């Protein structure tokens, strides 16, 4: 009679044996950062209802922000498995900081990398990847949630650019953000993304 297979509750999908050496190294680095740098500060942050922007700079120094962004723009140039492993290790400690990290790395940096001009990539991505700047993603609206088709925020073409008019809510990172990727409909009703900076009005 064959022996029963043994269930590994710490790795039920046997993920570890499927990872490359680089992916394991990234996971271990993220795990160490989360345990050593993030965990000791999370309880104090909860107690005092504060977010520590310095954690973003430390994430950037460790290479955890913009993991999939090309190296020439300050990212780590890693694959999405590595990005998922980073997110998983941060999530183990704190869902809030993982959400903030994901907004920065995915919802802010990826649109700039995929659709931004070369000048925008050069200007924004390195500072976002380093954590020097914090970004947010403005889609959700008070009356329509996150349904882009129903959004009422408008972008009106004016001399020198666009004027945005509308309201957004529940925007992760917005209280401490330096860069904003905001979505609005133009005069033709097409949905467009705009990169804004703190202080622009």
Q: Which residues fall in each region the model found?
A:
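Intrinsic disorder at enzyme termini
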Residues: 1-22
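Mature N-terminal segment immediately following signal peptide/propeptide cleavage
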Residues: 17-38
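A structural motif shared across PLP-dependent enzymes of the aminotransferase-like
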Residues: 27, 50-54, 75-83
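C-terminal helix-coil-helix/basic helical segment that borders enzyme active sites and/or dimer interfaces
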Residues: 38-50
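Internal helix-loop-helix
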Residues: 61-132, 172-179
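A short, Trp-centered hydrophobic/proline-enriched beta-strand micro-motif
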Residues: 131-139
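Hydrophobic, small-residue-rich alpha-helical packing segments that form membrane-like cores
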Residues: 146-147, 162
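A short core secondary-structure module
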Residues: 152, 161, 165-201
């Amino acid at each position: 009679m064959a022996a029963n297979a043994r269930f590994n509750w710490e790795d039920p999908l046997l993920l570890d044996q499927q990872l490359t050496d680089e992916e394991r190294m990234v996971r271990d680095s993220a795990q160490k950062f989360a345990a050593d740098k993030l965990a000791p500060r999370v309880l104090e942050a909860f107690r005092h209802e504060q977010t520590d922007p310095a954690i973003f700079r430390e994430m950037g120094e460790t290479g955890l922000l913009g993991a999939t962004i090309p190296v020439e723009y300050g990212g780590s140039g890693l694959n999405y498995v590595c990005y998922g492993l980073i997110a998983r290790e941060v999530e183990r400690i704190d869902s809030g900081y993982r959400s903030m990290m994901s907004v920065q790395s995915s919802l802010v940096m990826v649109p700039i990398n995929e659709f931004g001009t070369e000048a925008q990539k050069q200007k924004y991505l390195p500072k976002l990847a380093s954590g020097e700047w914090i970004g947010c993603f403005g889609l959700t609206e008070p009356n329509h949630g996150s349904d882009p088709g129903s959004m009422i925020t408008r972008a009106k073409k004016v001399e020198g650019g666009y004027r945005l008019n509308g309201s957004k809510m529940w925007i992760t990172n917005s209280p401490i953000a330096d860069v904003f990727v905001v979505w609005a409909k133009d005069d033709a009703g097409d949905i467009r993304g705009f990169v804004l900076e703190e202080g622009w009005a």
